[in-house]
Amino acid sequence: MGQKIHPTGFRLAVSRNWASRWYANNNNFAAMLQEDIGVREYLKKKLKNASVGRVVIERPAKNARITIYSSRPGVVIGKKGEDIEQLKTELQRRMGVPVHVNIEEIRKPETDAQLIADSITQQLERRIMFRRAMKRAMQNAMRLGAQGIKIMSAGRLNGIEIARTEWYREGRVPLHTLRADIDYATSEAKTTYGIIGVKVWVYKGDTLGRNDAPVVEEVAEDKRPRRNARPGDRRPRRDGEGGAPGARRGAPRRGAGKPEDGKTGE
């Protein structure tokens, strides 16, 4: 079922971590989860031009710590930090607790699945051919170190009457391998013909997670041939030397036990 399950949820606690890191009892869990969803939707709309990859929310001791991963941190911070202060004030009003906002830069946006998906949807909204947008994104990702990438688009592609799905893949994308670092993201393009969905899988190589153990090399076997053994022959030989273990000894060789020429036994 590796082809169907969500790649991030499949690898949680093995090689990936949660995007919301807090604990709540049964009474408050639903409200806090809904609050996280609202915060992420607000940040996605507010920072649409800042190339935000993901948002991590932590809640330590009646506080909130929000980490925003962006390839353009200057757009998030703003001139002299004005935009980040306004953002912090709005988040405190929404969450009702003191909020600390951290900005982390994404060094290689061409290999980030969320940024790739958002870039393709923006091009589709500008009426760029979907095949050109997908292949260009794949070439950039492979050029900057990705070991494999798969992109899928579904909907009324190029304005056709019947919706269809098309996907392209380059390199390896091992979805069943738990130690594989698979970055997965989705995005939607709102066009005049309807919504076009985009899914992106990026394989960045294998990683040792918290539950992975180092691999112990096996001791090499002694591959020397056995004495008088015939390769591939499992049947007992007539002289009784070969064959499978425990095989019945063969008949005596011709001439065995006979007296030598010119001599007679007593």
UniProtKB/Swiss-Prot annotation:
Extent of the signal sequence: none
Biological processes, Gene Ontology terms: translation
Region (Disordered): 218-266
Sorted UniProt keywords: Ribonucleoprotein, Ribosomal protein, RNA-binding, rRNA-binding
Compositional bias annotation for Basic and acidic residues: 230-241, 257-266
GO molecular function: mRNA binding; rRNA binding; structural constituent of ribosome
InterPro entries with a match to the protein in the record: KH_dom, KH_dom-like_a/b, KH_dom_type_2, KH_sf_prok-type, Ribosomal_S3_C_sf, Ribosomal_uS3_bac-typ, Ribosomal_uS3_C, Ribosomal_uS3_CS
GO cellular component: cytosolic small ribosomal subunit
Family that this chain belongs to: Belongs to the universal ribosomal protein uS3 family.
Subunit-level organization: Part of the 30S ribosomal subunit. Forms a tight complex with proteins S10 and S14.
Protein name: Small ribosomal subunit protein uS3
Source species: Burkholderia cenocepacia (strain HI2424)
